[in-house]
Every structure is written in C-alpha cells, then in structure tokens.
C-alpha cells in the first residue's frame, strides 16, 4: 500500500520473524467448542444497583467479540509505556488483525528498521506520515524513504488485566 511519495508500507505475515526478534506472539487457534458466557443487559453504574435488572440478555463468546477474521489474527504482548494514552499498558495482550488496512489513525504493529513497535499511524500537520507515540515522554517516528517499515497488522482490541 502506498501512502504518498515513495514511502510504501509492506505487510508481512510471517509471525516467526516476530518471535525470532524476542516479541511474544500468540497464534489464534479456532476451538471446536465455543465458550459462551452470560452477558447481562444491566448496565453497570458507579452508583446504586437495581436488583430488578438482573437478567441475562444473551450469551457472549469472547472469540466472536474480539476476533473478526481468525485466519488473519494474532496476539502480541505490549512492552513499555509509549502507548499509555491509547489505553495500552505494559504486559497487555494486543489483538492484531493482518487483514485490516493500515490507514491514518489506526494503531499498528510495525517493524522500523527491524525493531518492533506499536504506535498510531498518522499524517502530521505537514502531511508527512509518522508513527505517533500516545505518551508525550516518547518522540514520534518520522517516516521517510530511508527507513525500512513493515506493518504487521492493525490492533483491534487490548486485553488488560486490572
């Protein structure tokens, strides 16, 4: 996919390359038996609960909720604090879809000169592409023809433990 000038984003589907570079990668596996858990229709308020609302709306399978295209999905563990503003914390599990187009505003898993990162793909005010850190303590990565950039996929969900 070309984003202007001669900067091209290349998608790579070889997850072994991620693992070889010390990135924790988890392949999605389709299980023959879905685990369906109850989803209650009651909204959770930060005030007083209403006991009259205690009924199950439907059952929910987290695979169906979090994974749209199983064959194109993988998981990776976040490291560092550059994406705190996007709700991505150290050790969070990121759900990544390789089939989604990496467009302006999407959070992506990218390799820049062989180093892996998670950042927001954006055009800056000058119209140049950057990988934006969602933490002011970290600089953006200015993309140019001298950088080798490989987009591995778009982050669709974050699994975060409290």
Give residue spans per PLM region.
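Short coil-to-beta-strand transition motifs
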Residues: 90, 112-117, 149-150
